[in-house]
Amino acid sequence: MEFVIGLLIVLLALFAAGYFFRKKIYAEIDRLESWKIEILNRSIVEEMSKIKHLKMTGQTEEFFEKWREEWDEIVTAHMPKVEELLYDAEENADKYRFKKANQVLVHIDDLLTAAESSIEKILREISDLVTSEEKSREEIEQVRERYSKSRKNLLAYSHLYGELYDSLEKDLDEIWSGIKQFEEETEGGNYITARKVLLEQDRNLERLQSYIDDVPKLLADCKQTVPGQIAKLKDGYGEMKEKGYKLEHIQLDKELENLSNQLKRAEHVLMTELDIDEASAILQLIDENIQSVYQQLEGEVEAGQSVLSKMPELIIAYDKLKEEKEHTKAETELVKESYRLTAGELGKQQAFEKRLDEIGKLLSSVKDKLDAEHVAYSLLVEEVASIEKQIEEVKKEHAEYRENLQALRKEELQARETLSNLKKTISETARLLKTSNIPGIPSHIQEMLENAHHHIQETVNQLNELPLNMEEAGAHLKQAEDIVNRASRESEELVEQVILIEKIIQFGNRFRSQNHILSEQLKEAERRFYAFDYDDSYEIAAAAVEKAAPGAVEKIKADISA
């Protein structure tokens, strides 16, 4: 039983597969059949009728016969073959020869594709032929008009073209021959060839028209404009030399020879080769070279104005610095009698004198070059600018040096004023310690006060010496100032601490009779207090009172601050 069921399942599967493949093949047959009908319905004959108004000779006749043969081949040979193969494919499918059926269908597809390509090619050639005829018919009149206009312009202005007239007229004759050839090809039905001929003449005419338009100007440039510019440049150069400008570095003779050779080259390529682009490029290069020379000449004029205007100013500035050098030198000697100058300060004066000598040499060198005939102003601009910069730098350095000299006296006065203030601070600090009735002054404060007195005295000694060494005096003064300020600050803190300790002990005395431990601690605090050990005294007293009455110390501090 199971065998029978299995067999039935296999048969059903085979039937289903056969049904599926046959259905797929039938669908492809229907598609190819529709394609075949579509090809047969294409309006090829109607499209071919579009050329009936053309002359049926030459290329037109050849194309028409070729198209008709190709269409007849498709209709009478390809399509019947396709029909026959479609029948074979259907028969193979009915007999379950699916592989054979598919091979036939592929062959049919190739035949229909080839037929489609042939039809598209025919339609494209028809369109090209008709379009060529239509465009040529429209454009030939424009070409004739442009030809006539070019011919008239050439004749009317023949004197402007010189030796090129015959060459241009020959080109026009060739274009006219091309127009005649176009007419002959059109008359012979060769519309494609005629189109190519017409386009070629259109390009030739456009090129020739540019020649006719551009050649007169280029010839005028070669024979009149540019030679005039060169002559003007030469005259301007000569005038500048007469005015005293040194222009040998420009090498104008060599440049003029180069310009003349380039001009001959431009005229040659224009007259013999009719190469407008090359001639224009050469003339453009000549113009750029001329402008470049003018820029050099203008630069020389500007350089001359700059050098000649600045040199007198620089000489005056230099002479003034020389005078100031002598004044500063004398001032330095005077200052040295009262003050001891550092090596760096003395070095600044020496450096100033050295740089001034160098500037003097540079100015002399430039003056010598100005007197020479071969040195151009443009070659001196940078040297003059460098001298100007150096003079400004020396002016600034010299002004700073003089300010430093003048500042020495100011520093001395400030130092003496600071000394007076420090002595006053020391006296006030000593009076504070004395009037505060403290048991004694801690050794470190006593040492600071003694050290401050020492540095103050050293500063006084330095200020009284001649020559005065302000650098060393300033160092002692700075040390004295630091020590005095620190001693004053710590003395004030000491007095405040002593008052606080006394208040804390006085507050703690309330509890002495009731608290033996507190009493002993306060005795120790008092002992330390009279031994000048105020820090430990405060710590012991504050700890004892705070233990007996928490918060009492802060309250005492607050009362004192109030």
UniProtKB/Swiss-Prot annotation:
Family: Belongs to the EzrA family.
Organism for this UniProt entry: Bacillus subtilis (strain 168)
Protein name: Septation ring formation regulator EzrA
Pfam families, sorted: EzrA (PF06160)
InterPro entries attached to this UniProt entry: EzrA (IPR010379)
A biological process term (GO) from this entry: septin ring assembly
Keywords carried by this UniProt record: Cell cycle, Cell division, Cell membrane, Coiled coil, Membrane, Septation, Transmembrane, Transmembrane helix
Locations listed in the record: Cell membrane; Membrane raft
Extracellular side: 1-2
